[in-house]
Amino acid sequence: MALLTTVLSLSGCTKKPDMDESVLIQLKKAGSDLSKPHNIEFFLYFPTQAVAEQAASKIRDEGFHVEVEKAAKGDTWLCSATKTMVPQLTSLQKIRRDFGALADSLNGEYDGWGTPVVK
């Protein structure tokens, strides 16, 4: 938690943490060692299987393991992208921007990421 507090105070930040910061804070509170690699899964939703497969191809080119399947609810398709990496705020924010732009370009939605706690 000290590292996250330092990052927030060094940036002069008094604003509410963004989505990625919030998840990192929750992981740290749960006892996760943020200096170790985590198996992080990112979630994108698309209106059709063809579009989800198109996104998956682009994401695979960036070194992610990707699976496409019908979403559990609704008529959308889930594109889940997994990568083992140290969860660093700047890297996660860049992925969010990149995946958000990709999803927007294909009429989809980027829905965040998750990872198990790593001790």
Segments the model singles out, each with a brief description of its role:
Residues 13-119:
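Long, contiguous binding/interaction regions
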Residues 1-11:
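Sec-dependent bacterial lipoprotein signal peptides
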